[in-house]
């Protein structure tokens, strides 16, 4: 995503902040993930957002590097056996496979710490920038989203028929997906409606609607489940995208209105990025996947809506948004 000039500036900054030292296993592990081939979307967003206000890339590159450190830390920890247990990352062995688990944990910790060391050294607006980043990656952001993701993995999010079945009792009843009144008002319809509602309540109390008891979820619940997946996407990914945009805006001296527009653009972009990822990864992993809940057509409609919102947010800015516009199009097309 970064143009070659900015990418080279980022590599120079990484080498300056984290010089190569083949005898230091921890530093080698940190550099291993940082210098692997990657899109660098988050650091790009810092630079591109600051460009809207005519800030030079070389003036924001240390902040962009700090954001990259945070992202790298999250990848290392996500790949650990206690998390996603992934053997590869960025077309190479994941950090704990290349080195070992203990080194991977420490490398992630060190990258996160280094990010805040860099940001605390800024001459201007450092507290504001640190606050925005902290909110995006803490319990209300990336880390909280990872916790939601892990705790949701035991749930089967695939679409189910309008039947609730409890394996341990053998009871099976078909529930109506909606209740419709067939009589005009004041003609006894209230009694029929009450009977229908009573039937549903009796059925729900009889059946044990918990996945641990072998339940199949009613199709009418899919909307709520999809919303939960979107919440995970928002917290794990979109909030750091948005923070990267807002931090670039802060560096550029944006107004509150401009900051909000860029933050919202980042949310739109991050949600598109994750939805596209769900489409591409559907055959490999159906867990916590929007495709499993909504189907491809509805997910694509969701992406189209987010794309339009992203364009609307960019239209509220008067500066050079070409880089951000191109990125929005590219992510919508390719993920």
Report residues per predicted region.
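Mg2+-dependent prenyl diphosphate-binding active-site environment of isoprenoid biosynthetic enzymes
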Residues: 15-160, 169, 196-276, 282-332
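Short, linear, compositionally biased motifs with a strong N-terminal bias
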Residues: 176, 180-181, 190-191, 198, ...
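N-terminal amphipathic/basic leader segments beginning at the initiator methionine
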Residues: 1-18
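Charged/polar low-complexity intrinsically disordered segments
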Residues: 165, 172-173, 182, 192-194, ...
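Intrinsically disordered, low-complexity regions enriched in Ser/Pro/Gly/Gln/His and often acidic
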Residues: 2, 122-123, 174, 178
């Amino acid at each position: 995503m970064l143009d070659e000039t900015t990418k080279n500036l980022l590599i120079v900054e990484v080498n300056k902040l984290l010089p190569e030292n083949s005898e230091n296993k921890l530093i080698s592990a940190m550099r291993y993930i940082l210098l692997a081939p990657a899109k660098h979307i988050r650091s790009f967003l810092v630079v591109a957002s600051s460009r809207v206000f005519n800030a030079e890339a070389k003036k924001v590159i240390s902040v962009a590097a700090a954001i990259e450190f945070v992202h790298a830390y999250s990848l290392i920890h996500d790949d650990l056996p206690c998390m996603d247990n992934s053997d590869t990352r960025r077309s190479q062995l994941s950090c704990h496979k290349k080195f070992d688990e203990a080194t991977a944990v420490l490398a992630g910790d060190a990258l996160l710490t280094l990010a805040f060391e860099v940001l605390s050294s800024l001459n201007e607006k450092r507290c504001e920038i640190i606050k925005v980043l902290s909110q995006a990656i803490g319990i209300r952001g990336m880390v909280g989203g990872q916790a939601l993701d892990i705790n949701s993995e035991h749930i089967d999010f695939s679409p189910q028929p309008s039947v609730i079945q409890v394996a341990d009792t053998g009871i099976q009843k078909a529930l109506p997906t909606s209740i419709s009144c067939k009589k005009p008002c004041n003609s006894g319809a209230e009694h029929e409606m009450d009977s229908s509602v009573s039937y549903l309540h009796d059925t729900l109390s009889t059946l044990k609607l918990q996945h641990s008891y072998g339940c199949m979820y009613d199709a009418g619940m899919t909307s709520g489940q999809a919303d939960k997946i979107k919440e995970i996407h928002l917290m794990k990914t979109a909030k750091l995208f948005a923070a990267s945009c807002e931090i670039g805006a802060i560096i550029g001296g944006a107004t509150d209105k401009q900051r909000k527009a860029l933050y919202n653009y980042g949310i739109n972009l991050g949600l598109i990025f994750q939805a596209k990822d769900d489409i591409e990864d559907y055959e490999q992993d159906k867990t916590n996947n929007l495709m499993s809940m909504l189907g491809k057509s509805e997910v694509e409609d969701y992406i189209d809506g987010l794309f339009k919102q992203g364009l609307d947010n960019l239209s509220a800015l008067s500066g050079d948004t070409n880089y951000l516009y191109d990125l929005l199009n590219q992510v919508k097309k390719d993920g």
